[in-house]
Amino acid sequence: MGKKFYITTAIHYVNDLPHIGHMYENVVADVIARHRRRMGDDVWFLTGTDEHGQKIERSAAKEGVEPIELANRVVANHHELWKTLNISHDDFIRTTEARHRVGVLELIRRIQERMPDDIYFGEHSGWYCQSEETFIPENQVKEGKDLDGHPVEWTTEANLFFKLSRYTKPLLEHYRANPSFVYPPTRLNEVVAFVEQGLKDLSISRSSIKWGISFPGYPDHVIYVWMDALTNYISALGFGSGDHKKLDHYWPADMHLVGKDIVRFHAVYWPAFLMSAGLPLPKQVV
């Protein structure tokens, strides 16, 4: 058996049916996975669905159904599409699965245990983009929209925060030491420029929505959808389950294959969470 090779796609939102962008990403990942298998490598190929958050909650309400009903219906479409395209994934993770919830809670527990002041309670006001499920910096908002044209709304919430600002220097050092961490180089340059501006602490809970994983110790808050979603890459390997054989074998991921619109989440937020928890970082975000 050759080298281990763990490849992941981004997990896809279930607020609507799968589209050509989802298909493109999974086909590219499938080609890479098949190639590595033919080379004799020990490949693990993960894909899945992101089923929590405001976007899904609102889409379900618009249809007059529960979020899990909408999720189940759309997930069935994903399974049908990947079967039709003969996508050779080894696992399919849903963020509504119990194994995923366990992994998310374990990540938070490790952060709080290792770096107790990395998570704290505070108030935040800013321009919130429902489409991206994140706050948008003031200089990226024009006439009520972000730079990609998505509408934003002014939001004030008392939430739990992650001390992302602490990781500005460690992240920049990691990029310099690992110049292929983000590929292509143009995307790495964008990430470096973003981080060099200085990172602000990140809101990691929401009290305005109910559809998600409850934050430990704060029953009125659900965990921020991106902290929830990103953890799929380790929860699918059994992180937090007590059986870490697959995690120990395949982690860190060799390649996170993602769309250009979510590079920041994978190249900034995700490695910062992992640094805080004392876990190895993925080798590459493509």
Model region roles, listed by residue range:
Residues 2-7, 50, 73, 77-80:
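Short, composition-biased local secondary-structure segments
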Residues 31, 55, 77, 106-107, ...:
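Short Gly/charged-rich anion-binding patches and loops
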Residues 2-40, 46-47, 99-103, 152-286:
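Structured secondary-structure scaffolds
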Residues 49-55:
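Short, charge-patterned binding micro-sites
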Residues 39-42, 85-90, 116-119, 275-281:
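Surface-exposed helix-capping loop/turn segments at secondary-structure junctions
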Residues 56-62:
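Surface-exposed, active-site-proximal loop segments in enzymatic domains
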Residues 63-215:
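Residue patterns forming the tRNA-binding/recognition surfaces of aminoacyl-tRNA synthetases
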